[in-house]
Amino acid sequence: NTLPKSKSSGKSFWCNLILLLILNIYMMNSKHCLIFGGSGQIGRNLIRKLTKNNYRVTVVTRNIHQKSYIIKTQANAGYIDIVEANIFDEKKIRALFKKTDICINLIGILFEQKKGNTFKNIHSIFPSLLAKLCKEYNLKHFIHLSALGINDAVDSEYAKSKLEGENNVLKNFPLATILRPSIVYSVDDNFTTNFMTLLNRLPIFPLYYEGKTKFAPIHCSDLTDTINHIISKNIYSKIIECTGPEIISFKELLQKLLYLINKKRILVPFPLPLAKFSAQFFELLPNPLLTSDQLRLLKYDNISSGKYKTNSEIGIPSVRYFEEEVKKYCYMWREGGQFSTEKYISKDLQNKIN
């Protein structure tokens, strides 16, 4: 004997089938983004936003076993693919362009390494390769992440390679949009987190160029909002300077971080010869805190030049302020953590208890 099939089970089957068909049609209409540098703070944030807006994403990584979990958890299943490849393996990279609508390059380095990771290779030759492939495969868009202040920093190898990369991109794919952000920060960065670690441990901290260098730090989420806007509004052939809502000197930045982690430290202006010597020493380390090239770069302000449109002028103003955002995650470096007793209990109350 068999049990009779209920009408409700039949209805649920057809409902599920219809929903599945609608989902497949929805995903078939989605655009495909190819992202290089997707495992970093900017890449992860961008993946979350693009996939929520029905973009399918392919992320290229050097080590799939190391980065797979970090990347896959940024999006729902079906919206993200991960490909392991060397970025200079043209045969493998070329195959990815056959099913791509938009290419986004977020790869960049702050210091050179011996095994091929030079400024020229990463910032100039690789973007040039991507731009040529974008043109060859008729991609709708290519978004390339560069850096702010590179026109002025003529004695910095980092800046020269970034500028050369921009020129190569526009030469090979004139429709490309180039973003020049100031310092990008978030809970996942290597900027504020490293500085707070050092300020937490060192009683004295050096000020290079008297701490007068100006920055316009932009939160990672504001930057990815800009990228998302550029894609959705089809903004082409532009250089866009991406800055935060405020200009802060290096000294002011350190003072804000010290206030947030509730520390008092002596900020000492470093003479240039001593700064150069310390940079040469740090270069001997695998991950140097400062290099000679970075020291040269620190001479120049990292703010909008006024020569190009900014993220605000294309309709996406930065809304996140440095101190307000860092306050959300700085407690990891503050004595007593998020619920520091001394911070929250008034002296009057402590006296009454005692």
Question: What residue spans do the PLM features occupy?
Answer:
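N-terminal Rossmann NAD(P)H-binding glycine-rich loop of SDR-like oxidoreductase domains
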Residues: 33-55
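Conserved Rossmann-fold NAD(P)-dependent oxidoreductase catalytic core, especially the SDR/UDP-sugar
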Residues: 56, 109-110, 116-172, 176-182
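NAD(P)H-binding glycine-rich loop region in Rossmannoid oxidoreductase-like domains
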Residues: 65-129, 133-136, 148-152
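Flexible, glycine-rich beta-alpha linker
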Residues: 156, 179-196
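Glycine/proline-rich active-site loop of Rossmann-fold NAD(P)-dependent oxidoreductases
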Residues: 186-194, 230-240, 246, 262-265
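Substrate-positioning beta->alpha
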Residues: 190-192, 210-231, 238-241, 252
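Glycine-rich Rossmann NAD(P)(H)-binding loop
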Residues: 208-213, 240-247, 258-262, 270, ...
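A hydrophobic C-terminal alpha-helical subdomain
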Residues: 273-354
